[in-house]
Design a protein with these regions (language model features):
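Conserved P-loop NTPase motor cores
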Residues: 1-108, 133
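Conserved P-loop NTPase motor module
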Residues: 1-13, 17, 82, 110-148
């Protein structure tokens, strides 16, 4: 895939130039639909930090990711996860996979926007990221179409 090779080439070029790269993949579940892209992503997920890069994946619904053994390995081996509101089936799978208690999962059950759980290494912390809705920063950061 041209896109994946372009990402890899950019990370390599930035490393040579002494620049840090942050690769952000929205709708990451799409990478797990096909064997080649899933394997590529897994390789990058494990190696890019050695090349001065960080990988971030985002998806609305993790159920599609959790159907992939490769994605499950990536979730389980990630040192930093942000969990926002989750569907019931997703909560159950994530709780099992990540060893998160039912009480802790309560923070991603019917959670308001910007509320959830942070999993950092072996620690799990609830958070509420509330930001004033007025102002330019909110407008820039908001992913809600009506807020633009």
């Amino acid at each position: 895939n041209v896109t994946m090779e372009t990402i890899q080439n950019r990370v390599a070029a930035n490393r040579l130039a002494g620049n840090y790269t942050w690769v952000f993949l929205d709708e990451i579940y799409l990478f797990f639909k096909y064997y080649y892209s899933a394997q590529f992503l897994y390789k990058c997920w494990k190696r890019f930090r050695k090349y001065g890069a960080a990988m971030t994946g985002a998806t609305q619904n993790v159920e599609e990711c959790l159907r992939s053994d490769t994605a499950r390995l990536m979730f389980a081996n990630s040192e930093f996860l942000v969990l926002l509101n989750q569907a019931a089936t997703d909560r159950a799978e994530l709780a099992r996979l990540l060893n998160i208690s039912e009480t802790q999962m309560g923070h991603v059950t019917g959670a308001e926007a910007g509320h959830g759980l942070l999993r950092i290494g072996g620690s799990i912390v609830p958070f509420a990221n509330e930001f004033p809705r007025s102002g330019e920063l909110y407008r820039l950061w908001s992913t809600t179409p009506g807020d633009k």
